[in-house]
Regions:
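Non-catalytic alpha-helical scaffolds and adjoining flexible linkers that form interface surfaces
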Residues: 1-20, 25-200
Length: 200
């Protein structure tokens, strides 16, 4: 089975002396694993960084055994934010979530598109809000919809929180998540409540 596709690097681990086993999220094939021979060489190591966009050519002689990748850099997302701890943390969080939650070899084109849009939007000032929306959308697309619409009412302001109970657990849900709209006034406290909600 041979194919070529664009993808984002989700994880990598050393394999033998000069190779890596990597997990990638591809546009057409979903999450895939493969060996990159020479992955620890200076040339390949420099761009084989988590969240970087690459093109992979997958070659497998036997469907029952892991194949190997030939790789080529497309967009160096990781080094772009080396000096920005928060955006770097966001990139690592995105890739870690996808690596943990996505099943192997099942295409999720909508999730792939949403990831590409989010990474492109990390340059915006409201990127943290967009990240939270992305997390909720990811959960929904994987079949775990929180159905926040049940807490919506016309008097709900963009700022502040709603105290609610979901699955017998009490939460403080930021109103901007319920309305699915970036608030005009950015609030660190609301963002904190949002991250607490999506991680519990």
């Amino acid at each position: 089975m041979n194919w070529q596709d664009e993808c984002y690097l989700l994880s990598k681990r050393k394999f033998r002396e000069n190779a890596n086993i990597i997990n990638v999220f591809t546009n057409n094939y979903g999450k895939m694993s493969g060996i990159v021979y020479g992955g620890n060489s200076r040339k390949i190591r420099n761009y084989l960084q988590i969240s970087n966009k690459i093109i992979v050519e997958y070659i497998a002689k036997n469907e029952n055994k892991i194949g190997y990748f030939k790789t080529e850099l497309v967009d160096p997302n990781a080094p772009r934010y080396f000096n920005d701890k928060k955006r770097t943390a966001a990139l690592l969080s995105m890739t870690s979530l996808l690596n943990s939650l996505l099943p192997e070899a099942q295409p999720y084109k909508e999730i792939y598109l949403s990831l590409r849009i989010l990474i492109n939007n990390l340059t915006l000032s409201n990127w943290a809000y967009l990240y939270l929306f992305w997390e909720l959308d990811l959960i929904k697309k994987l079949g775990f919809d929180q159905n926040l619409n049940q807490f919506f009412n016309n008097s709900t302001e963009n700022n502040g929180v709603v105290k609610a109970e979901v699955d017998n657990i009490k939460y403080k849900i930021p109103n901007f998540l319920i309305k699915n709209k970036v608030p005009e006034q950015h609030s660190d406290e609301d963002l904190k409540s949002g991250f607490i909600f999506t991680r519990t």
